[in-house]
Amino acid sequence: MFIEHPLIKPKTLEARLYQQIIAANALKKKTLCVLSTGLGKTAIAILVIAGILTKKDGKVLILAPSRPLVEQHYNRLKQVLNIDEDKIIALTGKIQPKKRAELYKKGKIFIATPQVIENDIIAGRINVDEFILLIADEAHHTTGDHAYAFVAKKFKDKCHILGLTASPGSDIDKVMEICENLGIEHVEVRTEDDEDVKPYIAKVKLIPIRIDLPNEFKRALKLINEALKERLKILKDAGVINSIADVTKTELIELNNKLFSYDEEVKYELIKVCSEALKLMHAKELLESQGKSVFLNYINKLSMQRTKSAKSIVNDEKVREAVNLLMKSDVEHPKLGKVVDMVKNILEKNKDERIIIFAQYRDTVEKIVNLLTQNGIKAIRFIGQANKEGKGMSQKEQIEAIERFKKEGSVLVSTSVSEEGIDIPSVNYIIFYEPVPSEIRFIQRRGRAMRGEGGKVYVLIAKGTADEAYYRSALYKEREMKRLLKNMCYLLNKRLQKKFEEKSKEEIKEETEEIKEKEIESKTAVKEETKEEEEKTKKPVTILDFIKQIEVKERSKSEEDKIKQEIKIPKKPIKIIVDVREKNMAKLLHNYANIELKTLEVGDYVLSDRVVVERKTAEDFVNSIIDKRLFSQLKNLKKVEKPLLIVEGENFSRLHENALKGAILSIILDFGIPIIFTKNAEETADLLIKIAEKEQIKEKRTVMVRYGKTAMSLKEQQKFIVESLPDVGGALAERLLKHFKTVENVFTAKEEELMKVEGVGKERAKKIREVLTAEYEG
């Protein structure tokens, strides 16, 4: 059976009762839908879109976390929805911002990554009021500072909401945060244990495969462990940890943060030792779980770092011995050979079988793909976009990789980028190169095998290593999440109901107070009207008075209608150019200024044609002094006419007080750059707005990037020349040019003529003429 609906093409969407029930409930309230992988979250989204658009006229936005997933939703909606295909639009960062602004006017349904929508909200390219539905696919991302959360908060009070996820997590407070950010009023949950979904769930068998490490690895790991224990002993002797046994990375990260509050005499050495211990622990895990090449790459990266902790590890005798031992050995991690053997065995039984291998690191993905290819197996790489090292796949390459895998590939070797939502049908075998401690990622990886007829999931575990702990952790968290999901509907809906009842009480209270205020205003107005009427009765009413009354009523009505038609996003009086890397600050600023995101060569914020601001957090300020980046950045900042440095926060504890004072004095005296300290991001934003207002409103200066390749327009050049005159700012330069028409006329004008311009007194006119006529003494 198929769904029959005027907005859904015939025989394109299978009719499943549980999907229809969930969609019907989701149309009544803002809903978070938690549905196991393979149960058709996209189908529910389509049913809700069709339902909403049948009742209301407006636009729909679907958020998806990756570009390939955006493309997938786009193709599926075009295939199923009975809507003009030109009205269904996929938006990515590849489309120019101006073009996106035009597309928002033309389209009906938009599919985009949250980062694109976030940028367009900040820059004022999208009108949120035009949307009647927001669908957040993979809604578990709607937490913290994620772009999902920013977009959700902008939309939740404006339109209907549907959140979709297979794995919201095992912490009910985190799930409540997701609900809060999306404005969720109701939760729908279905797991593989629910009777109405059981017929559609594929059975998956989880098979752990434990692998012994080679002797060369064990000897190298022993040396790294000894180096690690030396650091942990220092921390224990200092009394900051209780034992050197079973210390976790999480505990060391927490300790590192605590150490900043310790006395100056001891904290720097302890922070260094703690940082070394963390790096050694990470190196150890890489060798245990990933292999020799990934471990050696990490040590090589440390050798290129300037920090004391990195140098200490690279120069450590035991670490050097471990590195030499591995470099001389031809042995690689036995997981690699095991993967090749497993793939061969599966394909020998069925040459048309499809297999997905998940590996956490890109280096490991490359290694696996190369090994499989050498063994005559068609392996396709699937990784995320370019990172700091420049490696990665473009959106086009990702989509092509999925299509190749569907048509001709036997094995897809992937990082976590393919865990979410990518439609790869009929996959019966999954191999985890390593276990992941996150229950969300564990479920999503395994879920790739729940879409076909069911299958097997193999997890490779290096015996006696962190792999064992991560595997146990993932299983425990998954059990906890399932337990939570069973009670989630009841618990969450109860919490949400309580929350909305409290909100309603508050709203009723506010409304009551508002009504009382209006009653008082109304009584006052009635008294005044009565008084006016009494006065009018004293005068005879003429036909002219009657006509005037009708004209006033008609005019006020037509003006009201005109206002309703012309309501748009209010234009903000100032503009700020913000560097693309400063997006969090742009989020704070966009409510008060028009924001243009741009890659800036110098500084972080352009507030006018002469003021450019570099912003640093206290931590970054300290780090940039230590690694000597700061002074090269300040040399660049000197390119602008009026540079400014803002340092935000109060945590300067990593740097000695004398060194900090010396750096501040050098910035002010040697570089001539003013420095302002702020407590937090909000205070910084307020300061930036005030400077921009002064420059643009009071001084009437334009906002432009004056350094680099950008050339000034003729008008800007004229203004720039006139501003060079004594006591002439941006506003006065503009008045002089408007009065005299040309720069030449300004420069040849006599004192009396200059004084005719507002703001030019006798003294100022005299100074201007003196500069223009005095002989140059070379």
Curated annotation (Swiss-Prot):
Gene Ontology terms, MF aspect: ATP binding; ATP hydrolysis activity; catalytic activity, acting on DNA; DNA binding; nuclease activity; RNA binding; RNA helicase activity
EC numbers for this chain: 3.6.4.13
GO biological process, one term: DNA repair
Residues covered by the Helicase C-terminal domain: 338-516
Helicase ATP-binding domain segment(s): 22-186
Enzyme kind, highest EC tier: hydrolase
Binding site for ATP: L35, S36, T37, G38, L39, G40, K41, T42
Keyword terms of this UniProt record: ATP-binding, Helicase, Hydrolase, Nucleotide-binding, RNA-binding
DEAH box (motif): residue ranges: 137-140
CDD domains with a match to the protein in the record: DEXHc_Hef, Hef_ID, XPF_nuclease_XPF_arch
Stored SMART domains: DEXDc (SM00487), ERCC4 (SM00891), HELICc (SM00490), HhH1 (SM00278)
Reactions accelerated catalytically: ATP + H2O = ADP + phosphate + H(+)
Domain of life where this protein originates: Archaea
NCBIfam families: PRK13766.1
Family named by the database record: Belongs to the DEAD box helicase family. DEAH subfamily.
Name of the protein in question: Putative ATP-dependent RNA helicase MJ1505
Biological source species: Methanocaldococcus jannaschii (strain ATCC 43067 / DSM 2661 / JAL-1 / JCM 10045 / NBRC 100440)
Origin organism lineage: Archaea, Methanobacteriati, Methanobacteriota, Methanomada group, Methanococci
